[in-house]
Amino acid sequence: MARQKKYSGKGGARKKNKQKQSVAPRRRVEFRYKGFTLEELQEMPIKKFMEIVPSRQRRTMLRGITPNQRKLVMKIKKARRLTNRGKEPRVIRTHCRDFVITPEMIGLTFGIYNGKEFKDVTLVEETVGRFLGEMAPTRAVVQHGSPGMGATRGSMFVPIK
């Protein structure tokens, strides 16, 4: 009598041993913003860059820059000169949350004020065309613990440990 195969109970079908296929590491796709590479964006004049950003950012840039934003631009240029010399620039601290991230700011570290403290953010390619304020949220989700004695009316009748 032929020997019966054991039923595994998983749909009745037997799994075949498949040979593991070697998976090649995924290549990182070259970053593009609206069809332009980062190098093209960095060489592009600011007027041309303004044409490809969304309308909200374009409107902000068209309105001009405030004195505080002008100081930030000077700090960015100074930090860019330091990186070109091979030195590591310090964190650029700023309160300007409404400043549009331009391609020349990529790679620099900013301390963006969120109303309480400066959040250190290193700008990467994907942040081009966004506002600095988007990188440092002003509100955090509060996770409360269990209420203490006297915190609620219902805790009046809870025995003290």
Swiss-Prot record:
Protein S19 forms a complex with S13 that binds strongly to the 16S ribosomal RNA. Pfam families: Ribosomal_S19. GO terms for cellular component: cytosolic small ribosomal subunit. GO terms for biological process: ribosomal small subunit assembly; translation. The keyword Lyase does not apply. This is Small ribosomal subunit protein uS19. It comes from the Archaea. Residues 1-19 have a biased composition (Basic residues). It comes from Methanococcus maripaludis (strain C6 / ATCC BAA-1332). Keywords: Ribonucleoprotein, Ribosomal protein, RNA-binding, rRNA-binding. Belongs to the universal ribosomal protein uS19 family. One of its GO terms (molecular function) is rRNA binding. The keyword RNA-binding applies. Residues 1-26 are annotated as: Disordered.
